[in-house]
Amino acid sequence: MKGVILAGGNGSRLMPLTKAVNKHLLPVGPYPMIYWSIMKLQEAGIKDILLISQKEHMPQFYKLLGNGEELGVTITYQVQPAASGISDGLSYAKRFTKKESFILLLGDNIFEDSLKPYTERFEQQGKGAKVLLKEVDDPERFGIAEIDEKNKRIRSIIEKPEQPPTNLCVTGIYMYDAEVFSYIEQISPSKRGELEITDVNNLYIENSQLTYDVLSGWWVDAGTHESLYLASQLVHQALRKGQDEK
């Protein structure tokens, strides 16, 4: 299985920190944010990684990461001309993934769990897609999943619902088969002019092919000043705990 990391966008919610640097290069604990996605993939045995971002950010990423050798992976770079949505960014991974299944990470998602058990279950699934969910206290802020717990399927995904059916938000951790690229071709830009990943996931739902797992550890979308600070706190706590257990 290959890995794809989306690391684009202008990081407007993290201004002025992102005025001169891509948000995925900001520190989270002792490392740049982008390291965490790469290390999670590497720990799960996924070492062939595509990093997607805008052209102006690529020199910074390449200076930091090079070909990935220092982190035990192989990194390929792909330009997304404009930050036009997750599905648009993902569409540029088609040549890299070929006809293989793969895992997609949003580079600002910092989380505790190992990816390995989830990727193994997805490989056993054989086809379709899987998303990882997380219980949250403020479901009105997220895309929320209505689930069929018996069959481990997602019935629907509702963006920022006023009356959430559950408190299970869709995180930025997705697994797809090669069919995803034909689904991307079928969707249209949203009101904000972007190709939304929820529209792609809904096509999988229509075919009863979107499964889920729920993260057991902590998870943070580190896209704001508050959540970036929280992610650093949680990372430092986890590192201290690991040192204490040695």
UniProtKB/Swiss-Prot annotation:
Any matching Pfam family: NTP_transferase
The protein's name: Glucose-1-phosphate thymidylyltransferase
Catalytic activity entry: dTTP + alpha-D-glucose 1-phosphate + H(+) = dTDP-alpha-D-glucose + diphosphate
Organism: Bacillus subtilis (strain 168)
Keyword field contains Transferase: yes
Enzyme nomenclature, EC number: 2.7.7.24
Keywords: Magnesium, Metal-binding, Nucleotidyltransferase, Transferase
Record-linked InterPro entries: G1P_thy_trans_s, NTP_transferase_dom, Nucleotide-diphossugar_trans
Superkingdom classification of source: Bacteria
Gene behind this protein: rmlA
Binding site residues for Mg(2+): D108, D221
Function of the molecule: Catalyzes the formation of dTDP-glucose, from dTTP and glucose 1-phosphate, as well as its pyrophosphorolysis.
Cofactor descriptive note: Binds 1 Mg(2+) ion per subunit.
Swiss-Prot/TrEMBL cofactor(s): Mg(2+)
GO terms for MF: glucose-1-phosphate thymidylyltransferase activity; metal ion binding
